Curated annotation (Swiss-Prot):
Localization, UniProt: Cytoplasm
Source domain of life: Bacteria
Subunit relationships: Monomer.
Cellular component aspect of the GO annotation: cytosol
GN (gene name): pgk
Organism: Maricaulis maris (strain MCS10) (Caulobacter maris)
Gene Ontology biological-process annotations: gluconeogenesis; glycolytic process
Enzyme Commission (EC) number: 2.7.2.3
Protein name per its UniProtKB record: Phosphoglycerate kinase
PANTHER family per the UniProt record, alphabetical: PHOSPHOGLYCERATE KINASE (PTHR11406), PHOSPHOGLYCERATE KINASE 1, CHLOROPLASTIC-RELATED (PTHR11406:SF23)
Molecular function, one GO term: phosphoglycerate kinase activity
Length: 403
């Protein structure tokens, strides 16, 4: 992979540095209820202020669709961010234009200005060249620190980079460095755990992973489709019968590349999908027509643990069962605890990502034990699919514009 341009390589002293951050935080009644994403931006902001930069923050919040929606104003973020920084955060009520430019010009070295929600402008999500140019007037150079938005070619993530020297912030660097280490140049053997409801949402992911990992375990509802393609009856389970050919192509690709493809061998069954119904543990070949597969069984988890023991790197995306409904969280929780223990006590590099995955690891109480957890949903998935992310491509290679 081409090297990314890092903010440490730029001369930022006295310059207006535009930083694209992810401040799409949970809010209730105008109050930030979870400051995790604000905290993630602190290292880059503090690095720049200490280096004497004038920091101008760009972010989106919600989906206002190009209109000014007062409830989606980023002004509510200013005080929580100021509290975390221990310093004032100024706010521009407009996203671009003379007043916004004037606000950036008024900054002293080491001060921070937050620009209003970029999605209040219709040109943000359409990557309008005119709006991108207007945003570029707010700074002398640009830093992307929002991996979670890097898969979107928007004005504040891609268009702006055609006007300013562009670099990766510290949080973005951390994401990329860990993902490159896990997928592009990993310690081998590599095992990937992929779960979730539908194969259709992760076809590209599976097709990319079988070419890059040594072992691929598929769980969750996705596994039902692969089992069905092998001629195994899955009863009334969620199953995409129209994807049999796709599933068989994945098996063939795995065999061709020498990737061992693992599926559940025993399963937890129920006739109703509800919390704590009557369940039955059975071999995967012993599913009745009126039963649903809702989790992997204990023998499968043991086999998965043994496969993890044989691996040096683990990549995890998606739960292994219907984890949000007990008791069908058991396999996911047990596998997560096993992987976490291997990461803490052994030398396993354990990387996970995706919204459901993060929730599952939090539920298992092991988030802090994984080597790295990406909170980016779509961007993490697209990276794992081997796709080029516009926001990343924009900060790679030799800069066309030099600060």
């Amino acid at each position: 992979m081409t090297e990314i341009r890092r903010i440490q390589d730029a001369d930022v002293a006295g310059k207006r540095v535009l930083v694209r951050v992810d401040f799409n935080v949970p809010m209730k009644d105008g109050q930030v209820t979870d400051a995790t994403r604000l905290e993630a931006a602190l290292p880059t902001i503090e690095y720049l202020t200490e280096a004497g930069a004038k920091v101008v923050l760009l972010a989106h919040f919600g989906r206002p669709k190009g209109a000014v929606v007062p409830e989606m104003s980023l002004e509510a973020v200013c005080q929580p961010l100021a509290d975390l920084l221990g310093d004032a955060v100024y706010f521009s009520t407009v996203t671009s234009g003379e007043d916004a430019v004037a606000a950036t010009m008024d900054l002293e070295a080491g001060e921070v200005l937050l620009i209003e929600n970029t999605r209040f402008a219709a040109g943000e999500e359409t990557n309008d060249p005119g709006f991108a140019a207007a945003l570029a007037e707010l700074g002398d150079l640009y830093v992307n620190d929002a991996f979670s938005a890097a898969h979107r070619a928007h004005a504040s993530t891609e268009g702006i980079t055609h006007h300013l020297p562009s670099y990766a912030g510290l949080a973005l660097q951390r994401e990329i460095d860990h993902l490159v280490a896990a997928l592009e140049s990993p310690k081998r053997p590599v095992i990937a755990l992929v779960g979730g409801a539908k194969v259709s949402t992760k076809i590209d992911l599976l097709q990319n992973l079988v070419k890059k990992v040594d072992t691929l375990f598929v769980g969750g509802g996705m596994a039902n489709t692969l089992l069905h393609a092998q001629g195994i009856k899955v009863g009334s389970s969620l199953c995409e019968t129209d994807l049999v050919d796709t599933a068989r192509a994945i098996f063939a690709a795995a065999e061709e590349s020498g990737c061992k493809l693992m599926l559940p061998t025993d399963v937890v069954l129920a006739k109703e999908f509800k919390p704590n119904p009557e369940t039955r543990l059975a071999a995967v070949t012993d599913v009745e027509d009126n039963e649903m597969i809702l989790d992997c069984g204990p023998a499968t988890v043991v086999a998965l643990g043994q496969a993890i023991d044989r691996s040096a790197t683990l990549i995890w995306n998606g739960p292994l069962g219907a984890f949000e409904t007990p008791p069908f969280d058991a396999a996911t929780v047990e596998a997560a605890k096993y992987a976490a223990r291997a990461a803490v006590e052994g030398e396993l590099i354990a990387v996970a990502g995706g919204g459901d995955t993060v929730s599952a690891l939090n539920q298992a109480g092991v988030s802090g034990d994984f080597t790295f957890i990406s909170t980016a949903g779509g961007a993490f998935l697209e990276w794992m699919e081997g796709k080029t992310l516009p926001g990343i491509a924009a900060v790679m290679g030799t800069p066309e514009l030099v600060a």
